[in-house]
Amino acid sequence: MKNVIIVCGLNGAGKSTLGKVLAEKLNYRFIDMEDIYFPKDDPNYMYSNPRPFEEVERILLNIISENDSFVLASVKGTFNKEIVSHFKCAVYIETQKETRIKRVYERSYNKFGERILEGGDLYEKEKAFFDFVKSKDENTVEVWLSSISCPIIRVDGTLPIGNNAELIAEKLGNQF
């Protein structure tokens, strides 16, 4: 039996950060969808060449076949039925829009520095991404969550990561 826990939430919610801590706590592998979508084939900008969705699904199915238990960080899990059937639990990180936008900007600045500022070589690309994050429908994850049948654990994305990981592990212990 596969134990795939999807940690979902909008950009900047804290999926990767919480997912890594949770995976370590549960002794599961951690997978970040960002790493699957964006191959590291451009050393100057890691988001240059996104993979087609069908290829992403193939890679994810291979990961599922090779691993019994892992935590998957993804905005939402709108994948084919075969993939979704392996989700044993969804963790939804609820985080206010202002906090998320601030985190996204800080993360980009920490990765790319002044290259994201006006006049920098990544300014246009990052500005387009920031605009995308700001315009994203706040209910998009909620709508997806209503379509799945596995248990959903909701956590506050502004609480300490360790506290959220402990809460999730406790709830998972009661469910599995």
Language-model region placement:
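Pre-Walker A (Motif I) flank of P-loop NTPase domains
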Residues: 2-4, 68
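Hydrophobic anchor at the beta1->P-loop junction of P-loop NTPases
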Residues: 7
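P-loop (Walker A) phosphate-binding loop of NTP-binding proteins
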Residues: 10
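ATP-binding Walker
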Residues: 13
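Walker A/P-loop
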Residues: 16
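Conserved substrate/cofactor phosphate-moiety recognition/catalytic segment
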Residues: 20, 24-62
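Conserved phosphate-donor/acceptor-positioning beta-strand/loop module used by diverse small-molecule
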Residues: 86-107
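Small-molecule kinase domains that catalyze NTP-dependent phosphoryl transfer to phosphate-bearing small molecules
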Residues: 113-164
